[in-house]
Amino acid sequence: MEDLLDLDEELRYSLATSRAKMGRRAQQESAQAENHLNGKNSSLTLTGETSSAKLPRCRQGGWAGDSVKASKFRRKASEEIEDFRLRPQSLNGSDYGGDIPIIPDLEEVQEEDFVLQVAAPPSIQIKRVMTYRDLDNDLMKYSAIQTLDGEIDLKLLTKVLAPEHEVREDDVGWDWDHLFTEVSSEVLTEWDPLQTEKEDPAGQARHT
């Protein structure tokens, strides 16, 4: 109804403005068109009033209205739950108050030079190995070592063992010339008796 009234007003305004530009005949035609529109509007208003009078009034209140409201509320609640499920969830499980993780660019990431990094050595407890001198001292001092496995007596062996100064040789630096002369002299001393023994039987045979 309101749209029709607005159209009627616009047409009247356009006709009123166009009357100044038209002649007498045109004004008569416009007046007839205006009367025709007024008749249509009056018929529409009458039909609208009769139709509104014929419609029964809605009944308000009662248990039926409450059930309709409850069904509408449930439908809205189910729609909200579905909308919440369809939303993209964040990593923390909540869309509100969560920080968006930022992926750094490859240019910002500093390449680590693993060549210059040296791994720390493992810490291993190494047992100290006893030297021969320590073993000799323990063998001479402690009588507990004189028995092996608690059954074998090693006293006879310890009595026959030679002292260290007789077994150990002095570390002397070798000179090639000096070593060659010593070896050659020893070889010659060994060869001289053999040569004399070989020569003596021949001489004895001649004398006989």
Curated annotation (Swiss-Prot):
The modification N-acetylmethionine is found at M1. It is found in: Cytoplasm, Cytoskeleton; Cell projection, Cilium. Its main location: cytoplasm. GO terms for biological process: cilium assembly; intraciliary retrograde transport. Residues 18-65 are annotated as: Disordered. Expressed in the retina, predominantly in the photoreceptor outer segment. GO terms for cellular component: centriolar satellite; centriole; ciliary basal body; ciliary tip; cilium; cytoplasm; intercellular bridge; intraciliary transport particle A. InterPro entries: IFT43 (IPR029302). The modification Phosphoserine is found at S78. Keywords: Acetylation, Cell projection, Ciliopathy, Cilium biogenesis/degradation, Cytoplasm, Cytoskeleton, Disease variant, Ectodermal dysplasia, Phosphoprotein, Retinitis pigmentosa. The keyword Cell cycle does not apply. Residues 28-53 have a biased composition (Polar residues). It is linked to Cranioectodermal dysplasia 3: A disorder primarily characterized by craniofacial, skeletal and ectodermal abnormalities. Clinical features include craniosynostosis, narrow rib cage, short limbs, brachydactyly, hypoplastic and widely spaced teeth, sparse hair, skin laxity and abnormal nails. Nephronophthisis leading to progressive renal failure, hepatic fibrosis, heart defects, and retinitis pigmentosa have also been described. Retinitis pigmentosa 81: A form of retinitis pigmentosa, a retinal dystrophy belonging to the group of pigmentary retinopathies. Retinitis pigmentosa is characterized by retinal pigment deposits visible on fundus examination and primary loss of rod photoreceptor cells followed by secondary loss of cone photoreceptors. Patients typically have night vision blindness and loss of midperipheral visual field. As their condition progresses, they lose their far peripheral visual field and eventually central vision as well. RP81 inheritance is autosomal recessive. As a component of IFT complex A (IFT-A), a complex required for retrograde ciliary transport and entry into cilia of G protein-coupled receptors (GPCRs), it is involved in ciliogenesis. Involved in retrograde ciliary transport along microtubules from the ciliary tip to the base. Belongs to the IFT43 family. Component of the IFT complex A (IFT-A) complex. IFT-A complex is divided into a core subcomplex composed of IFT122:IFT140:WDR19 which is associated with TULP3 and a peripheral subcomplex composed of IFT43:WDR35:TTC21B. Interacts directy with IFT122, WDR35 and TTC21B. This is Intraflagellar transport protein 43 homolog. It comes from Homo sapiens. The lineage of its organism: Eukaryota, Metazoa, Chordata, Craniata, Vertebrata.
